[in-house]
């Protein structure tokens, strides 16, 4: 076995494991009821995401890459996002937590076994070359971690307390003056085959006019000034479609913001109420 392949395989196996640890940590404190409930019509039940993670891994790292199949056709169909829109997924005969964990473990065991003999060199298989398909699966699992967090933010009832969390360092002063970026040519995209998806390739030169940009994301404090200055009542700040949406939905502030009393702003975060953090980046403003 080549040293380059052996090292890359160790890295790939470690990244697959790290992604799985995050997924399980994310779901560990979620109740069985919350796991199977569809908390919003635009989201899947969490248990569907969990099973889909394993089935997608089987599809790409076993079936398509090595011609190995563990599951019956019914399981592939059940976790195929193109066959079942989100409104259908709660009615499917989904794996429960225990069976999903057993399934994910079985898939991962087979994946690591086939990884040992996989040719990640300059072979003819574009999926295996440089470990592309393994990196794709790691990214896919993290994408569903994000979807799960969206679901947990949208769910009602008992608040979500993660098993553990990383405390962020205290922020410093925010520079509100915009930074000028001179125009000119720059390289957009990448030629990296191992980790970039097709919509990120290939590298190409783009000529961009000069522009101004904030040095940091817009903070809650800055956006609150826009809200209190009547920004949601002035159509000149919005596109036609955005203004129509604001009027139809009667939106007057970012989602989850509310005022328990005048001049006091709070937000609901994963089911818990907390004062609006002025230094945090504003979120939930897209339509």
Task: Give the role of each language-model region.
Residues 2, 7, 11-19, 24-30, ...:
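Extended beta-strand/loop cores of jelly-roll/beta-sandwich
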